[in-house]
Design a protein with these regions (language model features):
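Alpha/beta-hydrolase active-site loop
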Residues: 182-206
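Short, surface-exposed "cap/lid" segments of acyl-processing enzymes
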Residues: 104-111, 115-160, 172-176
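Short beta-strand/loop motif that positions the catalytic acidic residue
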Residues: 385, 390-397
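Accessory cap/linker subdomain of secreted extracellular hydrolases
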Residues: 254-382
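C-terminal motif of bacterial Sec signal peptides marking the signal peptidase cleavage site
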Residues: 16-20
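C-terminal catalytic histidine-bearing segment of alpha/beta-hydrolase fold enzymes
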Residues: 265, 366, 371-373, 396-407, ...
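Primarily recognizes the serine-hydrolase "nucleophile elbow" in alpha/beta-hydrolase
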Residues: 198-274
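Catalytic-loop region of hydrolases
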Residues: 24-121
Length: 444
């Protein structure tokens, strides 16, 4: 299917801009996941592109008519190519459960989605043959409603004619009652490899036509998803037989926390942060994932009195999975931020309003313990990439500092790493949106 049939989502993307278990590798191709078992389909839906158009918010109502016209033109062109009188372009989305392993090495069932393109011909769904596979890692969320299995992922529009696999991660979807291991790159990589394994099996069992014979695997993601994509890249390149079996080609991502150490270093050096929810997310992960390191401390020891006054409320918001990151960050501004001056932007908060003096002291025992946990998840160390990666970033990103991308380049060199700076001064969200446009328009 030719790329011209996907050009209409570019407007949607521009709207977005401006508004640890030990793997045994015992399975045969196509997977080599970390555990054995089988998938379970929870839902299998096919829906036309026009269904998405009906969900455009009222403030963007003016876009509906031109978008509908563009969809109609693409469908007409595809119908002509297929020799059909009329078709309706759409997606097939299958939500499934699959076995993997939890933070403590226990067996766990996780959820993910697999989706690919197709069309309706006289109301009958027809799959199209995907040209490649994309393992797409989703960005940071705190609301279960945002998970790939529960939402209409914008990433569906940017991966072209691919079989795209999107895992929910531990703590979302079927496991929403569990804490999410934020920035635990190793476990997220293993869970993603398992999602890929069983998603591919599911596709082979469900699709009429199968994959194109020369398919490749591409990894992608933005923000937290970028870190997880590079973590999967590490897993594949340190398991070369697995990389070969999966026809691994490259990684393309944006604005990822590849080095949690560098990220926290930058926050501490600046003395302020524009994404305060990162601190409870990180601290909860470290206490849950590394109890041996953090056993001498409590979460309360990490925080200021300002934060402790609302800690229970923030904990409930994170655990309940009903509030997005914007809502939680706003609570920080409203109830935790006490110090305001000319050097602080509207959405920023000084670390002294969030963290205890001990946590702000890199020589203190609790801060050293935190850094020990962060070091375990630093993707700039402990491996040598084989396959190329393209990383988008911005010097104006105050959420995930550019130092992360620069650290990857310094660690692995220009032969492996291509850096793509935002084409104009862009914050975190805009940089990720520009990445979507670039990936959509240029491909992997």
């Amino acid at each position: 299917m030719k790329k011209r049939f996907y050009m209409f989502p570019i407007i949607l993307l521009m709207m977005a801009i401006f508004t640890a278990c030990d793997p045994d590798n015992n399975q045969e191709f196509p997977g080599n996941g970390t555990v054995t078992g089988s998938y379970e389909v929870k839902s299998d839906i096919q829906f036309p592109m026009s269904l998405f158009l009906t969900g455009i918010p009222e403030e963007y109502a003016a876009f509906k008519e031109p978008l509908a016209s563009m969809v109609a033109m693409r469908e007409s062109a595809l119908a002509q190519e297929l020799g059909k009188a009329e078709i309706n372009l759409g997606f097939r989305k299958i939500t499934y459960l699959y076995p993997s392993c939890g933070v403590k090495g226990d067996s766990i069932t996780l959820s993910a989605v697999a989706f690919w393109l197709g069309y309706f011909d006289n109301g009958v769904w027809n799959d199209l043959k995907p040209e490649n596979i994309c393992l797409m890692e989703h960005y940071t969320i705190t609301s279960d409603a945002e998970t790939p299995s529960n939402a209409f992922a914008l990433e569906m529009f940017i991966t072209g004619n691919t079989l795209t696999i999107m895992p929910d991660y531990i703590g979302y979807g079927i496991t929403k009652e569990k804490p999410h291991p934020y920035l635990n790159h190793d476990i997220c990589a293993i869970n993603s490899i398992d999602a890929l394994t069983y998603g591919y099996d599911l596709f082979n069992d469900s699709s009429k036509y199968g994959m194109s014979p020369e398919w490749k695997l591409y990894l992608a993601g933005a923000s937290q998803g970028a870190g997880n994509a590079v973590a999967v890249h590490k897993y594949l390149d340190t398991h070369p037989d697995l990389a070969t079996k999966w026809n691994f080609a490259s990684t393309n991502c944006s604005s990822g926390p590849y080095s949690p150490v560098v990220t926290i270093d930058k926050y501490l050096a600046d003395g302020k942060v524009a994404y305060p929810v990162v601190f409870p997310l990180v601290m909860k992960t470290m206490f849950d994932s590394d109890p041996d390191i953090m056993k001498s401390f409590t979460e309360e020891m990490a925080y200021s009195q300002n934060y402790l006054a609302v800690k229970d409320e923030i904990d409930r918001m994170i655990a309940g999975k009903e509030h997005n990151t914007a809502a939680i960050n706003q609570l920080f501004i409203e109830k935790v931020r006490k110090t305001v001056d000319a050097n602080l932007a509207d959405g920023e908060i000084y670390l002294t309003d969030i963290l205890s003096p001990a946590m702000l002291d890199k020589e203190s025992p609790i801060c050293k313990a935190l850094y020990q946990c962060l070091e375990k998840n630093d993707l700039t160390k402990g491996w040598t990439p084989v396959h190329p990666m393209k990383l988008h970033y911005s010097s104006q990103d105050m959420v995930v500092p550019q130092e992360n991308s620069l650290a990857i380049l310094e660690a692995f060199g220009e032969d492996i790493v291509t850096l793509e700076h935002a084409s104009f001064p862009a914050d975190h969200t805009t940089t990720c949106s520009l990445w979507m446009v670039d990936l959509f328009s240029k491909g992997f």
